[in-house]
Amino acid sequence: MIDTHIHSDTRGLEDLELMAMCLDGVITLAHDPFEMKNIKVWEAHVEKLLINELERAKKVGLNLFICVGMHPRAIPPEIDEALDKIKSYINYNSRVVGIGEIGLEKATKEEKEVFIKQLLLAEELNMPAVVHTPRRNKEEVTKIILDEISTLNLKNRDIVIEHCNKETTKWVLDEEFYVGLTIQPGKLTPLEAVEIVKEYKDFADKILLNSDCSSNASDVLAVPRTVLKMKINGIEKDVIYKVAHKNAVNLFGLDI
């Protein structure tokens, strides 16, 4: 099992150890731990993931991978400089497997510009992109995200639209992108995720599971708990294997 979206820098070692006991791997992503008043603050955050978090994960035996990028709530003023740094971070460490967490929060002009630049960078580098959708106005902003992507005519379709609900799942699958199901208080319950997987099991190749484990209320066992619920509810083994493991390995090229 792989948890495809966490923020390990917000959790204690005991949580990382618990994940290591249950999961084959996790992906931690850049996010918005504080206001990015300048490029140095953003660099410090990303470099903490690349150095400190890998060291912490190693201590407890957690197989940790990383995505780097500018979260829509954490955009530094020096956008182009940050894009260059993302390139260097990807070259710096093979544990960097994607660009994220990017996306839109309020769909402002600046957010859209930064989002598009990062999608184009993912295209240039042939890397997966992990796209945030907000809790508020999720449907409206998800439509904007899909519209923005459609204008770019990207060859790279390795894009995960995160925190999908039942309605947005259909839209994302219609566009042939990956659906990220987040099992977290305020997003999906394990049973709600099970119902989505059950309804769209014919598209199981395009579904991923995650906990979005962060400083918000979270369940570090969200993925194994959801896998258990899928087994109890009679979802086929091959479907479970795809959404809980295989798709993540294939999409991000994980060495697991």
Swiss-Prot record:
Family statement: Belongs to the metallo-dependent hydrolases superfamily.
InterPro entries associated with the record: Metal_Hydrolase, TatD-like, UCP005295
Gene source species: Methanocaldococcus jannaschii (strain ATCC 43067 / DSM 2661 / JAL-1 / JCM 10045 / NBRC 100440) (Methanococcus jannaschii)
Name the UniProt record assigns to this protein: Uncharacterized protein MJ1383
UniProt-listed CDD domains: TatD_DNAse
Signal peptide from the UniProt entry: 1-30
Pfam families: TatD_DNase (PF01026)
GO MF term (any one): hydrolase activity, acting on ester bonds
